[in-house]
Amino acid sequence: MSSEDYGYDYDLLFKIVLIGDSGVGKSNLLSRFTKNEFNMDSKSTIGVEFATRTLEIDGKRIKAQIWDTAGQERYRAITSAYYRGAVGALIVYDISKSSSYENCNHWLSELRENADDNVAVGLIGNKSDLAHLRAVPTEESKTFAQENQLLFTETSALNSENVDKAFEELINTIYQKVSKHQMDLGDSSANGNANGASAPNGPTISLTPTPNENKKANGNNCC
Ligand SMILES: Nc1nc2c(ncn2[C@@H]2O[C@H](COP(=O)(O)OP(=O)(O)OP(=O)(O)O)[C@@H](O)[C@H]2O)c(=O)[nH]1
């Protein structure tokens, strides 16, 4: 039976989390990728939000469910629930703010402590349109990414530069990990939960499919 027979509109669901300091542009990267929207006056995220976009790889419909939360410490009482079931993460900093880059070490440690060992991770230097205010050299971030086995892209949520590329590279990497895991298991888990990815007609790990595409999950409704 195919997943369509079960009434699902995707074959695999990947939970991806966005992390990074407040104001680096996480919410705008999410809205640019999922809705092609940008908001110059966006307010700090309160609670947790998510939005989805479905892509096709190898003829399979991959639904990326991307979670966004506030970078501010005072809103961050949800850490372990936020990371639970994530198969990918993007650590975002602002290329014009060196403190946001220096804090990437903290975000990487928090991710490693809370997420699955197999989680695929990308580093994003956002606001590349602010080249005249650049405070973080590209080469420095590239080296940091290589040393920590992270994908690396500089993006602009404002003018869309590399936003699709950054998300698609991460989703592709997750997909390769899932495919490899299935091959290692002789494909016996074709509907299964390689690295925590959930398939509609396989066992659901920590994420259940949602009926609505874009949801807000504030406070008690969250996680
Ligand atoms: N120039 C420029 N500004 C951006 C870009 N992305 C986001 N911004 C602006 O940066 C500010 C913060 O953006 P948000 O997307 O709310 O940042 P955030 O990381 O979600 O912030 P928190 O929710 O507080 O964690 C807003 O004024 C955005 O308009 C970008 O690529 N270029």
From Swiss-Prot:
Polar residues composition bias: residue spans: 204-223
Record-linked Gene3D superfamilies: P-loop containing nucleotide triphosphate hydrolases
Membrane-topology descriptor: Lipid-anchor
Positions with a binding annotation for GTP: 20-27, 68-72, 126-129
Means of activity regulation: Alternates between an inactive form bound to GDP and an active form bound to GTP. Activated by the guanine nucleotide-exchange factor (GEF) TRAPP complex, and inactivated by GTPase-activating protein (GAP) GYP3.
UniProt KW keywords: Acetylation, Autophagy, Golgi apparatus, GTP-binding, Lipoprotein, Membrane, Nucleotide-binding, Prenylation, Protein transport, Transport
InterPro entries: P-loop_NTPase, Rab_GTPases_membrane_traffic, Small_GTP-bd, Small_GTPase
S-geranylgeranyl cysteine lipid attachment residues: C222, C223
PROSITE patterns per record: RAB
UniProt family annotation: Belongs to the small GTPase superfamily. Rab family.
PANTHER family reported in the protein's UniProt record: DRAB11-RELATED
Function: Required for protein transport in the secretory pathway. Probably involved in regulation of secretory vesicle formation at the trans-Golgi compartment. Plays a role in autophagy.
Subunit structure: Interacts with YIF1, YIP1, YIP3, YIP4 and YIP5. Interacts with TRS130.
Name by which UniProt lists this protein: GTP-binding protein YPT31/YPT8
